[in-house]
Structure formats: structure tokens, C-alpha cells
């Protein structure tokens, strides 16, 4: 498999309607690592460049990964599956931001080049929840609290007899 280039000339990628796909190790994403429990694993991706009216171009970005997060409730590690399918519009002037479709994310282009790994990493960072929570986690302490509450006699039960 061909390695993902560090930088891509955007105009060539757009006019050639290039497709980059493959996988990359999570360890190569320094900003994302700070949000994860560990940097094990790989990410599958696909970036397909297209022409876009009024913009420098756009890309269909698809990313698939299992990210290792720490549940804020249980403080245990869990795998968070991520499936991303988004459209990124490339701009080099804020005036073009209004030309982006409503469902399109903006990506700033400097000197005509983009870094595809940064685009993938940006998408993953946006997918990580602010407060990671393992939905499959059952909090044992809450279950015990419910059982204790059920076993205690209701102090108002005696009022029932006063009628």
C-alpha cells in the first residue's frame, strides 16, 4: 500500500479528482493521542477530492476507527467506535466561507497545500465526546442503592393505618 503523503498540492488533487485511501496508525496523530486512553490501533480512511463551485475544492472524507477512551463515570477504558462520512470545503479566504454548503466543514488552505493526516485527525477530534461515557456500563453502586431503598420500610406507611 502506498503511504499517505505528508502534503498534497490541492489544485492537482482536485483537478485529478484523486482518491487516497488506506490506514494509518493512531500513534501518528499527536493531537488526538491527548484525548485517548492509549494510542494502540489504526484508522481506516478515504479522502476523495472533487471540484466545487466557488471554492478551491472539496473532499469526501470517510474515517473508521475504534478509539480507546476513559469513561468519566466508571474510570474504566472502553472502545468508542467512530464512523465518519463528511464533506470538507477548502478555502483560503474568509469571504469564501459563505459559499460552503450547510453540511460542509471548512478547511483552511495555506500556500496551495493541505496535510491529509491533519484532515483525518481533525475529523476524529470532532468525533470524541467532551465527556466520554460507556453506554454499555452498568454502575453497580446505583443498583445497590436501589436495592437498599426497596428493602427499607416506608416511614409513612403507618399513616395509612390512621384513616
Predicted segments, located by residue:
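Helix-adjacent hinge/juxtasegments
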Residues: 58, 66-98
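Short, low-complexity, polar/charged sequence segments that are solvent-exposed and flexible
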Residues: 27, 39-43, 65-67, 79-82, ...
Amino acid at each position: 500500500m502506498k503511504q499517505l503523503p505528508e502534503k498534497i498540492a490541492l489544485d492537482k488533487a482536485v483537478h485529478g479528482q484523486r482518491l487516497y485511501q488506506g490506514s494509518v496508525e493512531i500513534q501518528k496523530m499527536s493531537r488526538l493521542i491527548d484525548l485517548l486512553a492509549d494510542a494502540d490501533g489504526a484508522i481506516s480512511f478515504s479522502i476523495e477530492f472533487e471540484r466545487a463551485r466557488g471554492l478551491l475544492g472539496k473532499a469526501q472524507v470517510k474515517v473508521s476507527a475504534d478509539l480507546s477512551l476513559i469513561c468519566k463515570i466508571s474510570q474504566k477504558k472502553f472502545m468508542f467506535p467512530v464512523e465518519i462520512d463528511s464533506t470538507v470545503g477548502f478555502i483560503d479566504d474568509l469571504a469564501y466561507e459563505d459559499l460552503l454548503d450547510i453540511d460542509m466543514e471548512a478547511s483552511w488552505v495555506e500556500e496551495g497545500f493541505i496535510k491529509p493526516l491533519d484532515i483525518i485527525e481533525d475529523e476524529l477530534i470532532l468525533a470524541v465526546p467532551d465527556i466520554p461515557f460507556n453506554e454499555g456500563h452498568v454502575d453497580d453502586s446505583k443498583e445497590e442503592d436501589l436495592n437498599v431503598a426497596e428493602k427499607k420500610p416506608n416511614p409513612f406507611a403507618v399513616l395509612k393505618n390512621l384513616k
